């Protein structure tokens, strides 16, 4: 963030979606390393606000995480 002396405010950088920035075409539920970036330590899915993903990719991400949970690739709850 840059400090603007005229108005004494911060200029915010534009948030960019991880998936559009890296030109991902499809989120695969078998890609556990990618999915774990968007899950908390307790196993919950992180929100769009935290991950800076667009609505389209957040929906696909949630579906992929839920499929991976049902296929027992990711635990439902981590203790």
Curated annotation (Swiss-Prot):
Gene Ontology MF term list: small ribosomal subunit rRNA binding; structural constituent of ribosome
Xref: Pfam families: Ribosomal_S18
One GO term describing the cellular component: cytosolic small ribosomal subunit
Coiled-coil regions listed in the entry: none
Alphabetically ordered keywords of this record: Ribonucleoprotein, Ribosomal protein, RNA-binding, rRNA-binding
GO terms of biological process kind: translation
Subunit structure: Part of the 30S ribosomal subunit. Forms a tight heterodimer with protein bS6.
Entry function: Binds as a heterodimer with protein bS6 to the central domain of the 16S rRNA, where it helps stabilize the platform of the 30S subunit.
Entry's family note: Belongs to the bacterial ribosomal protein bS18 family.
Entry protein name: Small ribosomal subunit protein bS18
Organism: Aster yellows witches'-broom phytoplasma (strain AYWB)
Gene that this polypeptide is encoded by: rpsR
